[in-house]
A protein has these predicted regions:
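Single conserved hydrophobic/aromatic residue that forms the stacking wall/gate
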Residues: 431-443
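A mature extracytoplasmic/lumenal domain signature
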Residues: 78-80, 93, 102, 130, ...
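Chitinase-like catalytic core of GlcNAc-active glycosidases
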Residues: 238-248, 264, 276-424
Length: 443
């Protein structure tokens, strides 16, 4: 071979080798998973001294908890939203109230850590152990950085099971940083299924992505639990409730009971309009009548005395947001029921604004305790379920009262366009929306 071509060939071979090496390197690098570990301080975010990151279920929270020694405190709003809505903040008395089926418990707030309730910078926090008294949850506390993961859903949970040891990554793809390693047999909570990667959450607070080939098929899982939930018992009638309201506007009007019911058939409950709020201290007016109750019982009718909030000058929000006022209403209602022999109480608080929702529910919980102590049926009147009345929280009502009543006759009214009073499509909203069907009364 001509000597003058040898250097050229050598250079060409070298270029080819470099190109091949580059291609091989590119291919290898493309398909070799990254071993880079995610910076957990970056993942959970910055925290001030004394703060702890929160992962609630499959959601990494922006809000922080507090930690003091081995005590962890959770923000009340997080507890109410995700874990247990029955912790009620009584701001006037600086205490948390918790209504069980049989008693109203309280825990005073402190400006220092150590007790069940800690108020810091005007924000209310609950000790984790206090939350666990009444709430079914699993808590996983980890350091570096300080974080707590809480699992609270244990029925019909979508899960996948790890088939072989692998990693959960920050994003979908083998080049994404590793959050944590998981072993074969680990059950992960499935957030979203994708083509090649699934978004999953570990019980101890990592939310990321796993190679779909490394997990089994999605399934519904029920986790075994030993926590004993508080159980409400209900005072219900053996037969279907057929109730009428009886508008009674004065003490003298009670005398017209016989005339009002003379031709009435098929009814087993009558609810006279006997009580209403008179001021924001919780005082009520009463025109209840023992003679009326006696006549009703002779006709085979139960009497559920009705209390309303129709007095324009009395703020329902101001009244129900006061623990003293709520207790005042309740004590007067119970006393009146005992005095005249009523069988139950019907609450007809209407046009409730969103800001009174929490206080209204607390009122029902507290009233339920006293009603059941005195063998009184508790029922509550509600508008047909719609988005703008969601704060009535009929599901929670159904857990604590005996009967949830839906006023289905308000589809059209004075001032609205003409139409049916209670059409079938309108009434169907009731049955689709309400979980308390055996104790649901609709009109």
């Amino acid at each position: 071979m001509n000597k003058k071509y040898k250097p050229v060939i050598a250079v060409a071979v070298l270029v080819i080798l470099v190109a091949i090496l580059g291609i091989v390197t590119h291919v290898v690098m493309k398909y070799i998973p990254s071993s880079e570990k995610m910076d957990l301080n970056e993942y959970y975010g910055e925290m001030a001294d004394g703060e702890i990151a929160l992962v609630i279920g499959t959601e990494k929270m922006e809000e922080r908890g507090l930690v003091d020694g081995d005590r962890v405190y959770l923000p009340l709003d997080v507890v109410n939203t995700y874990l247990n809505q029955r912790y009620y903040w009584d701001s006037a008395n600086q205490q948390i109230l918790y209504a069980t089926p049989s008693e109203l418990t309280s825990a005073s707030a402190s400006s220092e850590a150590g007790d069940k309730v800690w108020v810091k910078d005007d924000k209310v926090y609950l000790n984790l152990t206090y939350v666990q008294e009444f709430t079914d949850l699993d808590a996983y506390i980890t350091k570096d950085p300080y974080r707590i993961a809480i699992q609270y859903k244990f029925k019909n949970v979508k899960t996948v099971t790890v088939k072989k040891n692998t990693s959960i990554r920050y994003r979908g793809g083998i080049k994404s940083a590793i959050l944590t390693s998981v072993k074969k047999g680990t059950k992960l909570r499935l957030i979203e299924e994708m083509e090649n990667w699934d978004q999953v959450a570990t019980d101890d607070g990592y939310i990321g992505y796993i190679d779909k080939k490394k997990v089994g098929e999605a399934e519904k899982t029920k986790f075994e639990r030993s926590f004993k939930r508080e159980q409400y018992s209900y005072l219900t009638m053996d037969s279907k409730v057929n109730m009428v309201w009886h508008q009674v506007t004065s003490t003298d009007a009670n005398a017209y009971f016989a005339d009002a019911t003379a031709n009435m058939t098929g009814v087993n409950v009558i609810s006279p309009t006997w009580f209403y709020l008179t001021d924001t201290s919780g005082n009520i007016a009463s025109i209840a009548s023992a003679d009326y109750v006696s006549q009703a019982h002779e006709k085979g009718l139960q009497v559920w005395g009705l209390i309303d909030n129709f007095t324009q000058e009395v703020s329902t929000t101001e009244t129900l947001s006061s623990t003293a006022a709520r207790q005042n209403i309740i004590s007067q209602l119970i006393q009146a029921a005992q005095d005249v022999g009523m069988d139950g109480i019907n609450v007809d608080f209407e046009s409730l604004s969103e800001d009174v929702g929490t206080h209204f529910l607390e009122f029902l919980r507290e009233l339920s305790i006293e009603c059941h102590k005195n063998n009184l049926v508790l029922s509550v009147d509600n508008p047909v379920p719609e988005d703008f009345t969601s704060h009535y929280d009929r599901a929670e009502q159904g857990r604590v009262v005996d009967y949830v009543i839906i006023m289905g006759y308000d589809e059209h009214y004075v001032g609205s366009e003409a139409g049916s009073v209670a059409s079938l499509p309108w009434l169907s909203l009731i049955h689709i929306s309400e979980p308390t069907r055996p104790r649901l009364i609709s009109y």
